[in-house]
Amino acid sequence: MPVEALAQKAKEKDKEKATELEQIVVTAAGFEQNVKEAPASITVITGEDLQKRSFRDLTDALRDAQGVAVTGVANERDIFIRGLPGSYTLILVDGKRQSTRDARTNGNSGFEQSFIPPAAAIERIEIVRGPMSSLYGSDAMGGVINVITRKVADTWTGSVTTDGTVQQHKRFGNAGQLSFYTSGPILEDTLGMQIWGRGLKRGEDKFLSGITGSREHDLTARLAYTPNEDHDFFLEGGTARLRRDANVGNTIALGPRAVSTYNDNDRDHWSFSHTGRWGPTTSDFSMLQEWAERRNYNYSQADGRFIKQPRAPEVRNTVIDGKFTTPFELGGSHTLMTGGQYFEARLSDQNPGRRTGRNETFSATQSALFAEDEWRMADSFALTTGLRLDHHEEYGYHLSPRIYGVWDATDMLTVKGGISTGFRAPDIRSIAPGYAYTTGGGSCTYGPTGTCGVIIADPSLKAESSTSYEIGAIWDNGDVILGGTYFYTDFKDKITNMPVVDAAGNPVRWSEDPNYRLWYNYNIDDAVIQGVELTATWNATADLTFRASYTYTQSAQKTGDFAGFPLARTPEHMANLRADWYTPVEGLEAWASVNYHGEEIGAGPRIPTNGKPVTINGKLGRKYDAYTTVDIGTKYDVGEGLTLNAAVYNLFDKEVEQTDFNAVGEGRRFWMSLTATF
């Protein structure tokens, strides 16, 4: 290899190493900080890392991250952070929330993580583990995932990527994806544009309860206007279309009542934002509107076509955010952030339990004020304190304080820890007066002795809340980085729904329609979640890096019908080991990873019969087996702007089937991508 090429290769590796040690994040405090100094437990995944792997949605991006579990049944895999389900994690794109789960009833998991940009448009993903409600309000109870996109380029640039996955076993569906990203100036130094989009198609699995077929399309455009050095304006609009197909004889069992079906899950959004610099103070303002709808279609043998079903839930969210960030000196250096938020959610849907067939409109409005200050008392110690006051039109006021300290004990050792609070507002269907939510599954029966039920909304429900304590340390000598965190979360007032029974244990019928069993929402469950997160990075040589992480999560419900069981089906143990190697061949990199997903325990009134039975305090739950998978891959810079990536996932073809795991894991599969950059 020529000397010049070797020198360039060394520079690139040194740059990547420096970037790893000095990553800048914004999610933990609302302004830019070094990741080690951030007042939270935070992981960063770079856009470059995403482009080396098969990346279709956030679950692909986060499967290696410490403290994060991707779990669930085949079509509802969701992101769990520190033992809390996906609905307790706030997903942001450039700091703007995505909250369209209410548009998808009776199974809303597995979709929200798809409404994100392609890998080429992403600069990094920041994952904050633990409550962040003092800054972000409701839904940030388990943590925050913030997808940060790339800045508008000074010169026109872009890329097109095509990738595909071929399954070794024909019972799994193959997949193909095409994505693009482009950015550049319209008026030099004044007006710029970004456009990105993608199309994805995955075949339906050919076995019962497998992964449904999918077709996904999205397109987003953004204008950036900078009239002078003190002001930036951004205008963005985007659309996404997700379709899921399930056919009789493939993922739906054969039977006299079985019908093939598909659903469309649409999301449109637009946003306007402004950043202003007013001397030492910086202001950030944004307004976001998002609209989402689900439509279901069933195949009619009589008509020979798919017929749209009458129910089509639609949600429209409006979010207005504003904040000011001001540095000042008073007994040390301060960075004070103050701001507020207005959030209105409007749901248009049938009231299914009342069987009127008419759409009704339900709404909920929240507003908030918050303040947070980072006080650097000394060069080696910073204390962050924050307080947020939220007001919800139904349940009233809620305070979310936090305090967090970061101490640079030595040049290599940083100790950090604090107390954070979180809360989650009840969803609209749980508190809308008069709403009756049907339950019981597609095979339930409606009648005087039927098994179908209705869950009655209760406007008096309280917000779920948590208090989390954590202490951790990071040791970094340049070649080796070690990190460890212990966390403890006290979870209160979990909202659950249970059937109402009489003294003899028989189901109570709903007085307004005795053909339904009666269910109610309750604030009854308290739980404790605790765990340990360990991580290590070793730059063994200039060409070889090892990364490892381990997460232990233990949770137990303290009250309710399932006391003693975990709060959610999260693996007790997770571990990951990854190696990255710059080979002696110019432009060629290789990687390998091992992922361990430990045993899970699930319990609840609707628990399926998969897995092994387990009894705690006289109640029956299910245990799901652990499994380990191995992946290998490579990246090759062909030259002339072309990059080739390839990987073998689940190298040893580990079977993860519904019967034992209550989940479906694809077998050995082969992935390849080709990116053209211009």
In which residue ranges do the predicted regions lie?
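Extracytoplasmic beta-strand/coil segments of soluble accessory domains associated
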Residues: 59-100, 123
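Short acidic/polar hinge/loop motifs at secondary-structure boundaries
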Residues: 97-129, 221
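Periplasmic-side early beta-strands and strand-to-turn transitions of outer-membrane beta-barrels
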Residues: 153-265
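Gram-negative outer-membrane beta-barrel transporters
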Residues: 161, 324, 376-380, 487-490, ...
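Membrane-embedded beta-barrel scaffold of Gram-negative outer-membrane proteins
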Residues: 162, 282-298, 408, 416, ...
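Face-selective signature of the C-terminal outer-membrane beta-barrel domain
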Residues: 224-242, 262-397, 406-410, 483-484, ...
